[in-house]
Regions:
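Cell-envelope and extracellular/periplasmic
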Residues: 1-173
Length: 173
C-alpha cells in the first residue's frame, strides 16, 4: 500500500524526518505536482475539470501554508501513452495551461516530460506502462527536470535569507 503524506504533516514532523535540522526553522519553499494518470483514465469527468481542479489545489495549498506566492512546479504526465488518445493530450494541455494563467505568472511553471519516456522494450517491466515500464532512466530524467525547475523557482524573489543565525543579502547586479 502506498500512502501520501499531507505536506503539513511533513513540515510538523521535519525534526523527526530530518534530525540534522532539529531546531532549525522549516520553510516550505515549493510544491511539485506530478500526477494525472487517475484523471486520464476518467476522460468524461476528470479530464474536462482537470485544469480548474489544479488551480483550486494550488490556491488551497498556498492558503493552508500562508504562502500566497509559493512556487509550484507542474510535471507533465508521462507514460507509454505519450502519443495518446485525445483525452491524454487534453489532460497535458490542461497541465500546461495552469502555468500560463496570468494569476500564476512567475510562480507556477510547467515542466515538459514527454521526451523522457523510454520504450517498453528498453525497460525492465514492459507490461507495466502506467509506471513508465519501471525504467530508471525515465524516472531520473523526470526527477532531474523537476528538481532543476524547483531550484530555479526557489531562487526567485529571495533577496534576503536567514540561515542559522546569518542574514544573507543577495545583490544580483
Amino acid at each position: 500500500m502506498v500512502s501520501v503524506l499531507h505536506p503539513m504533516h511533513l513540515v510538523c514532523q521535519s525534526r523527526f524526518l530530518l534530525p540534522a535540522y532539529d531546531g532549525a526553522e522549516v520553510e516550505l519553499a515549493g510544491f511539485v505536482w506530478y500526477q494525472g494518470w487517475n484523471d486520464g483514465v476518467n476522460p468524461k469527468t476528470a479530464v474536462p475539470e482537470y485544469e480548474q481542479n489544479l488551480v483550486h489545489l494550488i490556491h488551497d495549498i498556498r492558503k493552508e501554508f500562508g504562502a500566497p506566492k509559493l512556487p509550484v512546479i507542474v510535471g507533465e504526465l508521462t507514460g507509454p501513452w505519450v502519443e495518446a488518445p485525445k483525452e491524454w493530450t487534453a489532460l497535458r494541455k490542461a497541465q500546461a495551461a495552469v502555468a500560463n494563467r496570468p494569476e500564476f505568472k512567475d510562480n507556477v511553471v510547467f515542466v515538459p516530460t514527454h521526451d523522457f519516456v523510454r520504450k517498453a522494450e528498453d525497460s525492465p517491466n514492459p507490461g507495466h506502462g502506467h509506471h513508465e515500464f519501471g525504467n530508471a532512466e525515465t524516472y531520473f530524467l523526470v526527477g532531474d527536470a523537476l528538481g532543476k525547475a524547483a531550484v530555479q523557482m526557489a531562487g526567485r524573489d529571495r533577496q534576503v535569507r536567514e540561515i542559522r543565525g546569518w542574514t544573507l543579502r543577495v545583490d544580483e547586479r
